[in-house]
A protein has these predicted regions:
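Short amphipathic alpha-helix that is part of the acyltransferase structural core
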Residues: 180-211
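A short helix-loop-beta-strand connector motif used in the catalytic cores of GNAT acetyltransferases and
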Residues: 4, 46-50, 218-244, 304
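Metal-dependent phosphoesterase signature
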Residues: 19-33, 206-207
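Asp-based phosphoryl-transfer active-site loop
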Residues: 5-24
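Substrate-recognition element of Asp-dependent hydrolases with the DxDx(T/V) motif
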Residues: 36-67, 76-81, 191-194, 208-210, ...
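Conserved Lys-Pro-Asp/Glu-containing loop-to-beta segment of HAD-superfamily phosphomonoesterases
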Residues: 87-108, 114
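Acyl-donor binding region in acyl/amide transferases
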Residues: 236, 242-320
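Terminal substrate-recognition subdomain of acyl/acetyltransferases
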Residues: 93, 121-122, 126-178, 285-350
Length: 350
């Protein structure tokens, strides 16, 4: 694992790791939690890192650990199969890249298996994990209120997915059924920390394909040459807060460019990116533009962003990828505009 990759999820073993003993070998009350590792887990949770369990234990072991640690585990894999496979499932379930996962286990053989099968995972002993709170991979530059709620947000996500799995209607009908609320508004200086966090953490839904510095974001917010809008997302399951933003350049010109559009992966499948792109097209047209352009860095990870651009009517010419790896997506603003769903509220811009 590269030293500059920020860990997004820590997967913990239970026996002799989070617990000071073996769950199934206790004659009476299960063993207590390891206070040092629980302190590390809580500190990392407060920094916005997701916590998960992968253990050769029955499900009740995970419930016990949840109770004694007070942790909001975003994913739990209890069973007798390969831990490498369990970690891969966790990565898929949480939509976290494997190279952004750390795995903590007391068993040297388990660590060796995971290291061999998933070489991009950062594999740690419990002793290493206790020190990891001081490592740069575990220290986000920005810690926002959304970050501190991340574990709970993923718990809400599981409840939402469970409800969707038994709902008989379409996606849009489900979004209405659960009271989806999207608010698009002009960004303010107080949004800067969250915008910086989104810039660093978003990969699949990020047109720039690379982080933007806090200084650059601050300049864009303050500049009269740019309009910056944020998107907040909530429903009956909970409030996700600020999950997306779009930056428009050249407002008032016949061609408006979008140097950056980004969205948290938590918003995937919930209509948020479609709504933000529809608003962007309509806002650009209302400003007098006849064309909208979005330069998008072509990466393996941001395929969902490029697909969403296509759904919004933006097209890149075949073979149009420039030397810097960016393709220019364009659409005319003189025809029919994408519709905004009824659950989208738009506040006044700057």
């Amino acid at each position: 694992m590269a030293s500059d990759v920020l860990v997004k999820c820590v997967v913990w073993d239970i026996d002799n790791t989070l617990l000071d003993g073996v769950f199934l070998e206790s004659a009476g009350e299960p063993p207590p939690a390891d206070p040092v590792l629980v302190a590390a887990l809580r500190e990392l949770s407060n920094r916005g890192l997701l916590q998960a369990l992968a253990s050769r234990n029955p499900p009740e072991a995970a419930e016990y650990v949840r109770n004694v640690t007070g942790a909001d585990f975003a994913a739990v894999e209890c069973g007798w199969g390969s831990k490498a496979e369990a970690i891969a499932r966790i990565a898929t379930d949480l939509d976290v890249p494997v190279d952004a996962i750390a795995f903590v286990d007391d068993d040297m053989l388990e660590r060796a298996e995971v290291a061999a099968d998933l070489p991009d995972v950062l594999v740690l002993s419990p002793e290493d994990a206790a020190d990891a709170v001081d490592w740069p991979q575990f220290s986000p530059a920005v810690i926002t209120a959304e970050a501190r709620r991340r574990g709970r947000l993923y718990a809400e996500r599981r409840s939402r997915q469970a409800a969707a799995s038994v709902f008989g209607g379409s996606r849009d009908e489900f979004l209405r059924h659960v009271g989806t609320r999207i608010t698009i508004a002009a960004a303010t200086p107080s949004d800067l920390p969250r915008l910086q966090e989104l810039s660093v953490r978003t990969h699949q839904l990020n047109s720039a394909g690379e982080p933007v510095t806090e200084a650059e974001l601050s300049h864009l917010l303050a500049s009269a040459d740019y309009e910056v809008a944020t998107l907040r997302l909530a429903d009956d399951f909970g409030d996700d807060g600020l999950v997306g933003a779009v930056f428009l350049a050249g407002t008032g010109a016949t061609s408006i460019s979008v140097p950056l559009i980004m969205m948290s992966c938590r918003a995937l499948g919930r209509g948020a990116l479609d709504a933000l792109l529809a608003w962007t097209c309509r806002a650009a047209a209302q400003a007098g533009a006849t064309e909208l352009t979005v330069p998008c860095l072509v990466t393996d990870r941001n395929v969902p962003m490029r697909l969403a651009l296509g759904v919004a009517g933006l097209r890149a010419e075949p073979g149009s990828v420039a030397a810097d790896g960016r393709a220019l997506f364009t659409r005319s603003l003189t025809g029919e505009m994408p519709e905004l769903p009824g659950w989208v509220a738009v506040e006044a811009g700057k």
